[in-house]
């Protein structure tokens, strides 16, 4: 393979991995540990 193709595939893989981790953090098991500042304010 060409160098440019390998770099493009590597960068794409990193972006997909980061997006997956962000979604897991936002909606998966760790999301229960996140605090909600709007809920804490309680107007």
From Swiss-Prot:
It is a single-pass membrane protein. It comes from the Eukaryota. GO terms for cellular component: chloroplast thylakoid membrane. GO terms for biological process: photosynthesis. Keywords: Chloroplast, Membrane, Plastid, Thylakoid, Transmembrane, Transmembrane helix. Pfam families: PsbN. It is found in: Plastid, Chloroplast thylakoid membrane. The keyword Lipoprotein does not apply. The chain crosses the membrane at residues 5-27. The keyword Transcription does not apply. May play a role in photosystem I and II biogenesis. Belongs to the PsbN family. This is Protein PsbN. The lineage of its organism: Eukaryota, Viridiplantae, Streptophyta, Embryophyta, Tracheophyta.
């Amino acid at each position: 393979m060409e160098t440019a193709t390998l770099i493009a595939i590597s960068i794409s893989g990193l972006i997909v991995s980061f997006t997956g981790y962000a979604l897991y953090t936002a909606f998966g098991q760790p999301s229960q540990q996140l605090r909600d500042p709007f809920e804490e304010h309680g107007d």
